[in-house]
């Protein structure tokens, strides 16, 4: 994992994400709703809801929006239902692409995802075609500007709690964990007084592909098109610096 900075990729696409902030809030609200519906409205007792709330806060979603989504899930009646679906395929230059969606209409979402791939230099694959190229990881970010950090002290906290790897840059520390150790590492860092800029479960590519400028521009269009879909919650690629 050394040399892979998810944070730098996130910052590189920040302007595009800022332009979609309203849509991001809508998608995260859906995740909060489903998590609260399945496991109850208390994030302290519902790990999936805690993850969704943390994701919302990382996106600067207002607390009122978060509370509204939880309250909606707690209301009487069946309410809404969404299926979790994963689509796999290849983008320009043979880059692997994973698409996670929450949908109330699988046919609609599958059609939209397929069109996005075919119109932007990609191809939708079969289940299992690229998933094996990614590892599920816990991912935590601590900004240097938020702390006077003694790196050895932080490293000790991370390793004792079960962290796997730390990537450092002038701006942030990026901490990776096995999925089963994510909660322990996150809680240990918070108890040690660290403010977490981001804390989530994510998919990390095992190998990064370098694209030329044309391929990168085409992949950016593909990712943008996928992220524009209301049902798509996350898009992961094996491209370097996207």
Swiss-Prot record:
On the tree of life, the source organism's domain of life is Bacteria
BP GO terms, sorted = regulation of DNA-templated transcription
Q: PANTHER family from the entry?
A: TRANSCRIPTIONAL REGULATORY PROTEIN YEBC-RELATED (PTHR12532:SF6), TRANSLATIONAL ACTIVATOR OF CYTOCHROME C OXIDASE 1 (PTHR12532)
List, alphabetically, the InterPro entries matched.
Answer: Integrase-like_N, TACO1_YebC-like_2nd/3rd_dom, TACO1_YebC_N, Transcrip_reg_TACO1-like, Transcrip_reg_TACO1-like_dom3, YebC-like
According to its UniProt entry, this protein's organism is Enterococcus faecalis (strain ATCC 700802 / V583)
Record flagged with keyword Glycosyltransferase? no
Q: Where is it localised?
A: Cytoplasm
GO terms (molecular function) for this protein are:
DNA binding
Q: For the region Disordered, what residue ranges are annotated?
A: 1-22
Question: Which named protein is this?
Answer: Probable transcriptional regulatory protein EF_0663
Q: Does the keyword Transmembrane helix apply?
A: no
The Swiss-Prot or TrEMBL record describes its family as follows:
Belongs to the TACO1 family.
- In what ranges is there compositional bias, type Polar residues? 1-14
């Amino acid at each position: 994992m050394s040399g892979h900075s998810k944070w730098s990729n996130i910052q590189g696409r920040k302007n595009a994400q800022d332009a979609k902030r309203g849509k991001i809030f809508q998608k995260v609200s859906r995740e909060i709703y489903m998590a609260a519906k399945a496991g109850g409205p208390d994030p302290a007792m519902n790990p999936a809801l805690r993850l969704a709330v943390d994701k919302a806060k990382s996106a600067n979603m207002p607390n009122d929006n978060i509370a509204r989504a939880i309250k909606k899930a707690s209301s009487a009646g069946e309410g809404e239902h969404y299926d979790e679906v994963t689509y796999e395929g290849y983008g320009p230059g043979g880059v692997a692409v994973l698409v996670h969606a929450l949908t109330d209409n699988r046919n609609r979402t599958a059609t939209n995802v397929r069109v996005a791939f075919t119109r932007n230099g990609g191809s939708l694959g079969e289940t299992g075609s690229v998933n094996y190229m990614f590892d599920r990881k816990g991912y935590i970010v601590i900004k240097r500007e938020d702390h006077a950090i003694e790196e050895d002290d932080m490293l000790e906290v991370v390793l004792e709690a079960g962290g796997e790897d730390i990537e450092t840059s002038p701006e942030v520390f990026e901490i990776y964990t096995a999925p089963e150790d994510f909660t322990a590492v996150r809680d240990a860092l918070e108890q040690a007084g660290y403010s977490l800029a981001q804390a989530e479960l994510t998919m990390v590519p095992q190998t990064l592909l370098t694209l030329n400028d044309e391929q990168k521009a085409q992949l950016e269009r593909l990712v943008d098109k996928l992220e524009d879909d209301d049902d798509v919650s996350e898009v992961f690629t094996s491209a370097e610096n996207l």
